[in-house]
């Protein structure tokens, strides 16, 4: 099976050669940054419909995590189009962070559709460097389908712990690698070099549960879920929470 991977990767590369040439010349990334929000605006509602009950179950736990202000200070890391807003309890003070500024107009639309929330600001920055946010300033951090595409999950989780107050909670929902040695994992390996370009850096074979377990949270609760959109090469999902 391992012998097949480089051969099939080469075949996929040849079939998508223009994309890889554009990436090599530096033309693809700006284009990807522009179109990716539109792609997410199409895919996330479909995913939300599939996972609605589980998301409501996960995010219903936010309600009791109010800070000194009497409201929940919530940071959505890699906020994208704001697809999670509908699941947050009323009164949350939401700060949005994403490295892609092209998401802002989609966020504006989501804000208008979710008046039960209080919006603080949109920060354009990578998760590895959230210096614009103060230490211990957040009661809750939400991270959904983000750790697959960051440069360093370890650094992102360090920053998450820094901005969370003591007792603050990270809620996560991430796709991860299929079981090692399975045919599904083999196909993830085959598609990953091309998928990273299509998906704005998204990696198919990350073992994100290990990063969470090694991030020095005081408590972690985690469960695995099947992928909501089975026609995509993304694997099973992990959902849960981690307490600082």
UniProtKB/Swiss-Prot annotation:
GO terms for cellular component: cytosol; endoplasmic reticulum membrane; lipid droplet. It catalyses: a thiol + S-adenosyl-L-methionine = a methyl thioether + S-adenosyl-L-homocysteine + H(+). One of its GO terms (molecular function) is thiol S-methyltransferase activity. Disulfide bonds: none annotated. It holds the Pfam family Methyltransf_11. Its EC number is 2.1.1.9. It is a peripheral membrane protein. Changing residue 98 to A: Loss of catalytic activity. InterPro entries: Methyltransf_11 (IPR013216), SAM-dependent_MTases_sf (IPR029063), Thiol_S-MT (IPR052356). Residues 1-23 form the signal peptide. It is found in: Endoplasmic reticulum membrane; Lipid droplet; Microsome; Cytoplasm, Cytosol. Keywords: Cytoplasm, Endoplasmic reticulum, Lipid droplet, Membrane, Methyltransferase, Microsome, S-adenosyl-L-methionine, Signal, Transferase. It comes from the Eukaryota. Expressed in the liver. GO terms for biological process: methylation. Belongs to the methyltransferase superfamily. Methylates drugs such as 7alpha-thiospironolactone, L-penicillamine and captopril. Thiol S-methyltransferase that catalyzes the transfer of a methyl group from S-adenosyl-L-methionine to alkyl and phenolic thiol-containing acceptor substrates. Together with TMT1B accounts for most of S-thiol methylation activity in the endoplasmic reticulum of hepatocytes. Selectively methylates S-centered nucleophiles from metabolites such as hydrogen sulfide and dithiothreitol. This is Thiol S-methyltransferase TMT1B. It comes from Homo sapiens. The gene is TMT1B.
């Amino acid at each position: 099976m391992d012998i097949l991977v480089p051969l099939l990767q080469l075949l996929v590369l040849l079939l998508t050669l223009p994309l890889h040439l554009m990436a090599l010349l530096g033309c693809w990334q700006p284009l990807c940054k522009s179109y990716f929000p539109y792609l997410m605006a199409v895919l996330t509602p479909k995913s939300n419909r599939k996972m609605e009950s589980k998301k409501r179950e996960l995010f219903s736990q936010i309600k009791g995590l109010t800070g000194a202000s009497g409201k929940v200070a919530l940071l959505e890391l890699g906020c994208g189009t704001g697809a999670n807003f509908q699941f947050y309890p009323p009164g949350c003070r939401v700060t949005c962070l994403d490295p892609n500024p092209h998401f802002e107009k989609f966020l504006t639309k989501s804000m208008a559709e979710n008046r039960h929330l209080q919006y603080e600001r949109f920060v354009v920055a990578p998760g590895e460097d959230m210096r614009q946010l103060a230490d211990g300033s957040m009661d809750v951090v939400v991270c959904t389908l983000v750790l697959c595409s960051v440069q360093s999950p370890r650094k992102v989780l360090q920053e998450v712990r820094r901005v969370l107050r003591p007792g603050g909670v990270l809620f996560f929902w991430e796709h991860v690698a299929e079981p090692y040695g399975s045919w599904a994992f083999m196909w993830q390996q085959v598609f990953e070099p091309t998928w990273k370009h299509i998906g704005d850096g998204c990696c198919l074979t990350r073992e994100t549960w290990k990063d969470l377990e090694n991030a020095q949270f005081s408590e972690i609760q985690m469960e695995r879920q099947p992928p909501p959109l089975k026609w995509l090469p993304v694997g099973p999902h992990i959902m849960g929470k981690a307490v600082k």
